[in-house]
Amino acid sequence: MATSKLWRQIAEEVAKEYSDVTLEHQLVDSAAMVMITNPACFDVVVTENLFGDILSDESSVLPGTLGVMPSASHSESGPSLYEPIHGSAPDIAGKGIANPISMILSVAMMLRDSFGETAGAEMIEHAVNKTLTQGILTRDLGGLANTKQMTAAIIANL
């Protein structure tokens, strides 16, 4: 609880610098329920790493897989880190079954957030959406495409 109290204190101090942003505190168990039952009520969730990991994994039930979820860890003064929410997924490494969408969308997020390249980010997102609309799906989405096939299809739709 001590770290949660410190987190709340720092969040309240930082929030004062952003008067155009509404700060709302919510316990993680309540946030987890709302994230699943009414995800549109959240714009941005800011939390410490442990709760962020829990909430991001739980939110994967919305699209049905971690394989389509990008993530970013932003730094106030240094570079940001962009990666698939599932991390390196060592249990499926080298098997050709990983869904590349989360990595590809992480690149789109990087283009937009770190480089201001909105047009490039939108091109990538459109290519991913078009590929999914065409019914090209990896196994985690109920399809048959392997990692290389999904990547090639997205590239073809750029």
Predicted regions and their residues:
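Short Asp/Glu-rich motifs
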Residues: 3-4, 35, 130, 150
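Glycine-rich phosphate/diphosphate-binding loop of Rossmann-like nucleotide-binding domains
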Residues: 1-29, 41-44
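Glycine-rich phosphate/nucleotide-binding loop
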Residues: 33-135
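Short alpha-helical patches at coil-to-helix transitions and adjacent helical residues
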Residues: 4, 8, 100-104, 147
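Alpha-helix capping and helix-loop boundary segments enriched in small/acidic/polar residues
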Residues: 2, 97-98, 141, 145
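Glycine-rich phosphate/pyrophosphate-binding loop and the adjoining helix
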Residues: 119, 123, 127-158
